[in-house]
């Protein structure tokens, strides 16, 4: 395994951050989340030696706080790929029903092409912690790790499948250079938005661009 894959990656959930690592301006709810033993999520930002860029998640989209976690403090790490079996077809919210419906197709795609996929966002957080953060109208956030180029016609075919699910699905293609939305790559746009540790920029080929 390449050394960089041993490091925490964007969307990984990490346990072990203490409240004393929060900055003085951190909101009270962020300290309460950490005191309850809940994880932080790795965010996409330039690395600092020995530190991981993370975000503390509270209730709702308005409760997000950026922070830095010492790498040495990590006690547990859960990657999006470890959460793919958490969907249910009956009796749960729309995002988890959508996950159950989509899982066989993504599993087959990954077996065929040697890829990996995972669950991120609120669905990933809920599956990893048991804390209910999803509602019937929540989105389902996913990632697909694609080290080699994915043809745009294949991206469009996958997007068309996502559009048939019972909730909006936001799938990010994780390339060696960063992340691009499947929805963008499936479009006819000449350039798409690539999100990398150094920031976001428009590129023609998100596989050939080298992240700074």
UniProtKB/Swiss-Prot annotation:
Q: Which domain of life is it from?
A: Bacteria
* Top EC class for this record: transferase
Reaction catalysed by this chain? Answer: apo-[malonate decarboxylase ACP] + 2'-(5''-triphospho-alpha-D-ribosyl)-3'-dephospho-CoA = holo-[malonate decarboxylase ACP] + diphosphate
Which EC number(s) does UniProt give?
Answer: 2.7.7.66
**What Pfam families does this protein map onto?**
MdcG, MdcG_N
Tell me, what does this protein do in biology?
Answer: Transfers 2'-(5-triphosphoribosyl)-3'-dephosphocoenzyme-A to the apo-[acyl-carrier-protein] of the malonate decarboxylase to yield holo-[acyl-carrier-protein].
Family matches, as HAMAP family = Malonate_MdcG
- What is the protein name given in its UniProt record? Phosphoribosyl-dephospho-CoA transferase
